[in-house]
Amino acid sequence: SDVKIEIEKRSIGSLGDMMNGKSYEDHLLRIKRVQESVEKSAEIKGAVVILKNTSEEKGDPKAALRAGFADTNRLTQFIVPDVLDEKAKDKPSKSRIHGAVLDIFRQFGYTEFADNRNTVKNPACAADVIGVYAYQTLRPLWAAESKSPVLTAKFLPAYVTFNARSGQVKAECGLFDERELSYPEALIAFSKLSRKDDFVDKCNKVARGGFVTKLLGLRDLYKKSDGLVLVSCNGLTRNLWHGISDTSISGYNMKKPFVPEKIKIGNSISERTEAFTDSHLRIIRLREGVSTLEVPDYYTEINAKGEFKQASGVYRRKDVFWGIESRPDNIEYRNSYKNCRADNPIKSFDECALMEYYPLQLREEDDPKQWVGYANLLRELMPENPSRQAVRLPAPLHLAKLMSEYFLLCDKEK
């Protein structure tokens, strides 16, 4: 269906000025001013906020403005003039404006349609896809002055469920009062929850069981209908879910490739072995080429003349699959041919990202390439970067990762 947009232009006056400092009290003052100046909306709206280029000053107001606007039921994205481009002066570039507007679309859970991308014949494309994600080192801004380590939550699990055919996006987290929220509702909830005194205690309580309860619930939920779990394998998720490590996988008894009799779920405290073969829930482990030495940076093919040629799509290498996006059609990617950021700080650069997929749990009748192909396709459905075909992570994980923008923290999650 078509998207209808109503635009209203307003001046934010001095709300966009730099704050006196960067303390929690400074943020609270600006949040209160936003609450007093901007009428609360009955429904969730988006606000694209244009700010002055104040990159060399202290007291950046963006985090406070985002929290204040969230309290008025508004999602926010900011536009500032190009920091390093002297030609821009006080005018932001068209690409920056375009990107900010499209990111507001993403914050509402908008994705591109998948049905026009040869997905009809792939049974995986009807499945709900659940991105399993964990934020780490969550220290709320209100704890900035304290030296106590107990005021930092080590991690917080969160889940985003996405169905490409319906376009529906739902978020779940143990911090929410409701079982699930729409994606924009979850962003606003995270903003408010991270400012509460019990935020760290609640994060620690939610994190205690790792992913065990959620995985068992998903196994039962998808007894007859198709579901697909995507989990990005890194140091944090391996600690929470030992069963996704290469060491654990090598010890599984396989009915056939990618169909283990049982898998390990949980961490050292809650680890247990469970069978998922009687469920229609599949699980795929992902590893990013840009973030681990275990995965190559890139893959290419050799043509009949023995020359290297560009590769894109999904390729199988032994028991893993590599997903490679098509070459981005943008100047940033072409800049990377012969230049680097160190020598050209004004220029922007881009690169293709290789993603490794390992089907941790499939059903015996499944074609692994169909399920991996669908997971890789989900990288191409996000709207906020129109100059390239794919983002780094499939849509549910991409959406889950970016929910952290609404936490009001000392430092963003790593």
Kindly give the residue locations of the regions a language model identified.
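Long, contiguous domain-sized segments
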Residues: S1-K414
